[in-house]
C-alpha cells in the first residue's frame, strides 16, 4: 500500500515538472498558437476591409493629363459662320501660327502654314516715328496682336471670347489687333505739338467694336465686342485763358 502511494506521488511530481511553463513553449499547431493565428488573420482581414471602404469613399484623384484633355475640348464651329461678309473685320485673325507683328489691312482670314505667315510679316510694327517730311505724331501708340478670353459686348455685358476654334478638324486661334497709347504724356506738357500755355492735354486709348466669335455654353456665335483701336489726344482749355 505504501509503495503504491509513493508511486502515485512520484508520477504526480514528474507530470508537474514536465508541464509547459509559458505560452512561449507551446509547440506549433497547439490550440494556443491556433488561436493566435486566427486572431492575426481576423485583424488583417478587418484592416483590408477598412482600407477598401476608405478608397471607395475617397477615390484617387484624376491624372493631370486627363484633366487637361477634358478642359481642352474645343467647340466645333460651323463653317457657314464665316461666309457672311458683314462678320469680317481687319482687326480679327484666325491662325494656326503666331500672327504677324502688325496688321496688313486685310479682312478676316485663316493662316494655316508658315509661308502664308511670312507673307504677312512684311509690315512691321511701327511706333509712329519721324518720317521724311519732318512730321510727328501727337501721341505715341503701339499695335500688337493679342488673345482675349473675356470682353465687353455692345450691350455692356461681359462675354466669353473663344480662344481656340475647331473648324474643319483644324484648331485655329482667334487674335485681335489692338492699338493703345504707349505713354499718356509723350512730352512733359502732355501731347506733342500742343501749346501748353493755353491747353491741357494728354493721350488716351479709345475703343471701338469688332465682330468676334464668342461662346455661351456649347454654342458659338458672333458678337460685337470692344477692343483698343486708337490713341488720341484729349485737350481742354486752361482756365483764365480766353
Curated annotation (Swiss-Prot):
Q: Where in the cell is it found?
A: Secreted
Gene3D superfamilies annotated for this entry? Answer: Cystine-knot cytokines
Keyword Heme (UniProt)? no
**Which pairs of positions does the record mark as disulfide bonds?**
139-203, 181-231, 191-233
Q: Which UniProt keywords apply?
A: Cleavage on pair of basic residues, Disulfide bond, Glycoprotein, Growth factor, Lipid-binding, Metalloenzyme inhibitor, Metalloprotease inhibitor, Protease inhibitor, Secreted, Signal, Toxin
Cellular compartments per GO CC: axon; dendrite; extracellular space; synaptic vesicle
SUPFAM superfamilies xref list: Cystine-knot cytokines
Assembly, in brief, is: Homodimer; non-covalently linked.
Q: Name the chain's protein.
A: Venom nerve growth factor 3
Organism equals Demansia vestigiata
